[in-house]
Amino acid sequence: MKKFIIAIVMSLLFAILPFEVAAYNGEIVKFKMNDSKIYPGTQRNISVYVPKEYDGKTPACLWVSMSGGSFMLDTLDKLIADGEIPTIIGVFVSPGQIRDAEGNAVRYNRSNELDRMDGRYAEFLETEVLPAVCKRKTADGREIKISDRATDRAIYGNSSGGICAFNVAWQRPDLFSRVYTSCGTFVSFRGGDQYPALIRKCEPRPIRVFLQDNDQDSWNPLFGSWFEYNELVLSALKFAGYEVRHSWGKGGHSSKNARAIMPDVLRWLFEGWPELPKKGKSQSKTVASMLVEGEEWRCIGENISDGAMLHPHSEEKVVLQSGKQKEFVFANGSRTKAKGKIVLSDPYTALYPGGTHTAKRVEGSNWVWDYINTPDGKLSHGQQFYFLYADAGQILYDASGYLYVASKVGIQVCDQNGRVRTILSLPGGEVTTIAFAGNHLFAVSKGRLYVRKLLRSGTHNGLPKSEKQG
């Protein structure tokens, strides 16, 4: 038991190595962050590595680490000097703590920040950490400027930092495109064990991933085997067509092996730069049956008001309702004031093609109910039927009888038997409202209006072919 406790303590130390002095040619700029609005009350240290090659004028590439950084500095120095990787500014972020007046920690925020499955930490980096970094200057007066292109940005972490690195890029591929995760906590801490399934079901992101773990990695067996879950994540990434490599080392929950291969990992992560990592082609038959090759989401409107709703109208257009104002929106992005009598559908009720079923969303639930429509117009035999990964928002059917659900994780698409087959992701992540116009799907995400051409249509032409119970 004593050995087990010592092993746990040592593994945590490796996971959150402090930033200490090491041999390097660049400069370290340090500051404290105590004013976070996303993680209120937390205090943390930020260390910024600025290589001597950085000129203070051209925005540099970015390397973010949630797991220390002193061991990386000589590696970054050498690879940058040799031209094997671009000029990179390193930002090393410690986990937050809340301290009392005497300086004693009363809350450790590490797991809450790093193990979560939402986009909160990505938002923290985007809106709080990086703006604070860019307000600093080096000792010789160079301003710190960081590229905002995803292809120029990489992120690393060990243990909880490992799953955080992956989650940040997964949630916001517009921010980061290159990921190094070691001993990643893809276990049942805060939902990370869902990733092997989600990776398979979601449309691939344009990110490149290097996975490292050790064959005896099981920090606490209560939560599962770290190594086994990392193997499942690797399998899922390969299935979904990602640019992925891995290295399985000997040992337990430690960053030692990850640090040893850091130079080779960095070379591979930035191979082909500045080209963006390629978006993979998934082996999912559902994804193949839905997506038009080369077609992506197009932003056709901004500053969409909170509470705005989309409604189907015809093959050519949808209705965008913002309060009392109604507009027709077309796939080319044009918008005109809606005229005449406009009948708006209930966004939380959907009629199955052919009229045999009715689906109803229940607020605050990750289930959608299904009812059978009787000849006299009543709903019967209601059941919780469609199981979701996040609470349901607006719902609608396509012509094949698949249910589309707007949610915080994107647009969840369920088959006729109530199972999520795929999740369509938008740049903003959360989707609040959706509507079909023919084979164009419209969606609102983070105040922006998007449209995408699909191989599926929202036009119902009778009862679709049954998938039976398979």
How would you label these PLM feature ranges?
Residues 7-16:
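Bacterial N-terminal signal peptides
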Residues 1-4:
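Positively charged n-region of N-terminal signal peptides that target proteins for export
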Residues 278-470:
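Sequence-structural signature of mature extracellular/luminal beta-sheet repeat domains
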Residues 23-281:
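Non-catalytic cap/lid and distal C-terminal segments of serine-dependent acyl enzymes
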Residues 17-23:
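Sec/Tat signal peptide C-region and signal peptidase I cleavage site
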Residues 8, 67, 157, 183, ...:
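Residues that line or immediately flank small-molecule/substrate-binding pockets and catalytic motifs
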